[in-house]
From Swiss-Prot:
<feature type="binding site">
    <location>
        <position position="43"/>
    </location>
    <ligand>
        <name>substrate</name>
    </ligand>
</feature>
<feature type="binding site">
    <location>
        <position position="19"/>
    </location>
    <ligand>
        <name>ATP</name>
    </ligand>
</feature>
<protein>
    <recommendedName>
        <fullName>Phosphopantetheine adenylyltransferase</fullName>
        <ecNumber>2.7.7.3</ecNumber>
    </recommendedName>
</protein>
<feature type="binding site">
    <location>
        <position position="11"/>
    </location>
    <ligand>
        <name>substrate</name>
    </ligand>
</feature>
<dbReference type="GO" id="GO:0005737">
    <property type="term" value="C:cytoplasm"/>
</dbReference>
<dbReference type="GO" id="GO:0015937">
    <property type="term" value="P:coenzyme A biosynthetic process"/>
</dbReference>
<dbReference type="InterPro" id="IPR004821">
    <property type="entry name" value="Cyt_trans-like"/>
</dbReference>
<dbReference type="Pfam" id="PF01467">
    <property type="entry name" value="CTP_transf_like"/>
</dbReference>
<comment type="pathway">
    <text>Cofactor biosynthesis; coenzyme A biosynthesis; CoA from (R)-pantothenate: step 4/5.</text>
</comment>
<dbReference type="GO" id="GO:0004595">
    <property type="term" value="F:pantetheine-phosphate adenylyltransferase activity"/>
</dbReference>
<feature type="binding site">
    <location>
        <begin position="130"/>
        <end position="136"/>
    </location>
    <ligand>
        <name>ATP</name>
    </ligand>
</feature>
<feature type="site" description="Transition state stabilizer">
    <location>
        <position position="19"/>
    </location>
</feature>
<feature type="binding site">
    <location>
        <begin position="95"/>
        <end position="97"/>
    </location>
    <ligand>
        <name>ATP</name>
    </ligand>
</feature>
<dbReference type="InterPro" id="IPR014729">
    <property type="entry name" value="Rossmann-like_a/b/a_fold"/>
</dbReference>
<comment type="similarity">
    <text>Belongs to the bacterial CoaD family.</text>
</comment>
<keyword id="KW-0173">Coenzyme A biosynthesis</keyword>
<feature type="binding site">
    <location>
        <begin position="11"/>
        <end position="12"/>
    </location>
    <ligand>
        <name>ATP</name>
    </ligand>
</feature>
Length: 166
């Protein structure tokens, strides 16, 4: 039997407990999960690509234990379906917080299925405890000196505190 690889794309700027929740679900479905950090030239991320890789890898080690070794973090600047193919994925993972996410993700899944019928999109609903968490809100709270510890892994909370106290 061949290993099943899933591709989980996002900006992860920063990684949140919501992302980790989806990642845990993805690890139930796949042997390996490739976390694809989308690089968009028009966007100015808070954390550099290298910082995001380090934060994801450290968070996975701290929060997922041995399962953290089943993830791989990569960058991509092309279509997500092309990135998934390059990394040998047969599944694309998408997290859902609410109906707004579902509407958008269904549209994207339909387009992706037309262009890459061999890739299966799997929607994983967020656990109730993380449904309200967004990276945008986390950045806003951190930028105003608020406590983001309930919303992100400890290593990310420390990095945000450092970033905004500089």
């Amino acid at each position: 039997m061949t290993d099943r690889t899933a591709f989980y794309a996002g900006s992860f700027d920063p990684l949140t407990n919501g992302h980790l929740d989806v990642l845990k679900g993805a690890l139930e479905l796949a042997d390996t999960v490739v976390i694809g950090i989308g690089i968009h030239p028009g966007k100015k991320p808070l954390f550099s690509y290298g910082e995001r890789v380090a934060l994801i890898e450290r968070s996975a080690k701290d929060e997922l234990g041995a399962d953290g070794g089943r993830i791989k973090v990569v960058a991509f600047d092309n279509l997500v379906i092309d990135a998934a193919r390059v990394h040998g994925a047969s599944i694309m993972i998408r997290g859902l917080r609410d109906g707004t996410d579902l509407d958008y993700e269904m549209q994207m899944a339909g387009m992706n299925q037309t262009m890459a019928p061999e890739l299966l999109t799997v929607f994983l609903p967020a656990s109730p405890s993380v449904r309200t968490v967004t990276a945008t809100l986390v950045r806003q709270i951190a930028s105003m000196g608020g406590n983001v510890a309930p919303f992100v892994p400890a290593v990310v909370a420390a990095a945000l505190k450092e970033k905004f106290s500089a």
